[in-house]
Amino acid sequence: MVKNKASSNAYRRLRTNIEYNSKYPNVHSICLASANKGSGTTTIACNLAITFVANHSKVLLIDCNINKPTINKYFSIDNALGLSDMLLNQDYSNYYRYCTNFKDDHSNNLLYVMGTGRKVKNTLDLLSSRYFQE
């Protein structure tokens, strides 16, 4: 997805800074958010996930923007089943059922991409529920 060497290096540098951050040495999740449409959050999230999968056996990228999903378009995946379905079904231990996986060409590691799933009326309630926290 990263098209040029300078961008690739920038994402690898960002990944390394996150991995070796002494203030938070055991980071297992990262949230990228923006208040402004078109600020590049999806591009950064997707490229950072791809960069992480080169060094880690499994990476899970979740599109939490249920009202305006975009990650499914970036990876050309179906958005019919995803995060909202997993939360509504309380089936979070079987997250892989709601994902599409991609194998990294160089490392054979897996990138799991979870789309938003079906649209729901109570998006904020769903994302602030204890099920999402788990």
Each language-model region and where it sits:
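Gly/Ala-rich phosphate-binding loop of Rossmann-like dinucleotide-binding domains
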Residues: 53
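Pre-Walker A (Motif I) flank of P-loop NTPase domains
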Residues: 25-30, 41
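P-loop/Walker-type NTP enzyme "switch/lid" segment
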Residues: 1-12, 16, 21-23, 34-39, ...
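Hydrophobic positions on the alpha1 helix immediately C-terminal to the Walker A/P-loop
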Residues: 43-44, 48
